[in-house]
Curated annotation (Swiss-Prot):
PANTHER family: UVRABC SYSTEM PROTEIN C, UVRC/OXIDOREDUCTASE. One of its GO terms (biological process) is nucleotide-excision repair. Belongs to the UvrC family. It is found in: Cytoplasm. Pfam families: GIY-YIG, HHH_5, UVR, UvrC_RNaseH, UvrC_RNaseH_dom. InterPro entries: GIY-YIG_endonuc, GIY-YIG_endonuc_sf, GIY-YIG_UvrC_Cho, Hlx-hairpin-Hlx_DNA-bd_motif, RuvA_2-like, UVR_dom, UVR_dom_sf, UvrABC_protein_C. It comes from Shewanella baltica (strain OS155 / ATCC BAA-1091). CDD domains: GIY-YIG_UvrC_Cho. One of its GO terms (cellular component) is cytoplasm. This is UvrABC system protein C.
Amino acid sequence: MSNEFNAQSFLRTVSSSAGVYRMYDVKNDVIYVGKAKDLKKRLTSYFRKNLANVKTQALVSHIHHINVTLTHSETDALLLENDYIKQYMPKYNVLLRDDKSYPYILLSQHEHPRLAYHRGPQREKGHYFGPYPNGGAVRESLHLMQKLFPIRQCDDLYYKSRSRPCLQYQLSRCSAPCVGKVSNADYDEQVKLASLFLKGKDQQVISALVDKMELAAERQAYEQAARFRDQIMALRKVAEQQEVSNNKGDMDVIGVHYSSGIACFHLLFIREGKIFGSRSYYPSVPAQTDMDEVLRSFILQFYLNADIQRTIPKEVVISHNFEELHELEAAVSEALDKKFSIKTNVRADRASFLRLAVTNATNAVVTRLSHKNTVEQRFVLLEEILELSTPIQRMECFDISHTMGESTVASCVVFNREGPHKGEYRRYNIEGITPGDDYAAMKQAVSRRFDKIEAGGKIPDILFIDGGLGQLRIAQKIVDEKFVHLDKAPQLIGVAKGEGRKPGLETLILGDTETSFSLEGDSPALHLIQHIRDESHRFAIAGHRNRRQKTRNTSTLESIPGIGPKRRKALLQHLGGLQEVKGASVAELVKVPGISIEMAQTIHDALRG
């Protein structure tokens, strides 16, 4: 503990009220946020002799000063604690990083409504169904909806531009309302059925379709009756495949497993009695954190994250009981201004769902631990091969990607002792070099990475360069220049491809001595190097392809006076692509919404000139 902090003197100033405390280190960074019903009693517990918890010992040793905020109640303290944790992200708190907005299915408010994937602010008028646990679940649902209900999924611009049915009509996945192939009444009926289906009311949809089929048969409209029959059969098949509960309400079921410092919260989103989707969360847990704190922190941060658009049910079922469960119920209920209950002792369908969630959480932790142990073993072997005196904590790898010098992109990927650390990945768009000059590209990328490096910054222990001696020398020169005034510099290693680019034949080159060596093809240390090299390669190629596609799609059209992003999008969507725009006549260009005869002539002349 810092000599500047006098615990006894501080504790004499603390009241026994409810409140929140923030612990700071010598750099004035918040390292821990906590709450208490009795601040004096809680804070005194940190400064007892013979603290048993290793995490608490480490925390106390870094305290420089403590700030206290009093609250009216313990519920207020819980809410304020959550706000402070989000604001400061303290290193000794359990942190849930859940910053992505959740996707929805949108049923738009339109003469002929469309079904669409939606993520972000809900500005467009219509009904939003969700949230879904991830984008894949939404796309899978939309794909299924196309087979069940012939409702359009195209955007409004494409819809307006149609003069004949598109391929989806030929595949019986859309009824082509854009060109009048279906009456408004029939289309509206399908929209209502789709809406009921998305609300989980399958049997109501099937009953309605059975009535329509029988009515069509009575009128001897056998072709229409057959279509309803096929739709009913498809719906029944889907309903059989979905696990359904007798409980028709909404709830979240949370299975928890915590082992060897890894916590997994596996959530089943139950909506209208069906498993709407599932998702695993892995909060960052400081060493030696007890289970109660992990549970409390997750519930608080997950259900009070106002930045995420999430539909919160009235009921949550969780696999573990914990000390402050009822206080959390009250805090979340007050914050949301709605009834909110947390249950642990459940039966029947709820118990079945809970067993499933716990099984998934347990399997996820076992898999992560296995992966973590494998990566750890590879790090240890690499340290032995390189004869390092200190453990490797951070590795980075650079790669360059381009097509004949076009749209050059450099990647920098980061690995720690748990594997890829994707939040630290970076891409660099390379500008101002001779196309195809990989040396200049590497020089620019490494220079930009270490331009503002300083002591205490994120310095890799090892920096891999995906390339031969020439690129390695360029990178080593830059590193020598940037780190001349610092005590620590990364060890550079070039990874030169072997004969025929076959894995296992790589040559490794040390940047400082230019000594080259190889490892056995089955060496776990080589597998680690190949992993970071391949990840860097993948990340560079993805960035290059995105940049190249954007350049090819935009530069030709947007260089034409009067063509901005909206008109470019209209041209590409209406005509099908850049090549089709280039081959279009003036008469065809005029048919695109927003393109006048003069503009069409300008586009035609510019692309043919």
